[in-house]
A protein has these predicted regions:
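A short hydrophobic beta-strand element
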Residues: 78-91
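Short beta-strand edge/turn micro-motifs at domain boundaries
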Residues: 103-128
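A solvent-exposed, acidic/Ser-Thr-rich amphipathic alpha-helical stretch
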Residues: 5-9, 24-78, 101
């Protein structure tokens, strides 16, 4: 993996670490304020930070919380100041939750802005 691809992958990992820590700011540091998202548990396209925050607020405290997120099998292509990331996310829950592990197929688009890679679009689908 080249240096630029590694930087993008580190930003992807930082988002997942922020999620597990319950740290929105850590996540948001790696998202463009105008990012769009296809979330696996929310059908409409999320457009921008305000819609993302509204979705997060509606979801807060509902359902089991993941205990581990492992992003695997990354495929990253960098085209100048744009990067395309594909990977599978393994989501694990506490055994007592009764929730099975989830496999989520993820594709994201990143843009280099002021020396930092920011996610401008994310698309995830739960694999059954």
């Amino acid at each position: 993996m080249g240096d630029e691809a590694r930087q993008v992958w580190e930003a992807v990992q930082a988002i997942y670490a922020g999620f597990l820590a319950g740290d929105r700011e850590a996540i948001d540091r790696n998202l463009s304020p105008e990012a769009t998202l296809w979330d696996s548990a929310h059908e409409p396209l999320v457009r921008g930070r305000a819609e993302l925050d509204a979705m997060r607020d509606r979801r807060a405290g509902s359902g089991p919380t993941p205990t581990a997120l492992d992003a695997v099998d990354p495929v990253i292509d960098v085209f100048g100041d744009v990067a395309l990331v594909r990977h599978v996310l393994l989501v694990r829950f506490a055994p007592e939750s009764g929730e099975p592990e989830q496999r989520i197929r993820n594709t994201s688009v990143w843009r280099l802005e002021d020396g930092r890679w920011l996610c401008v679009h994310n698309h995830e689908d739960v694999l059954r």
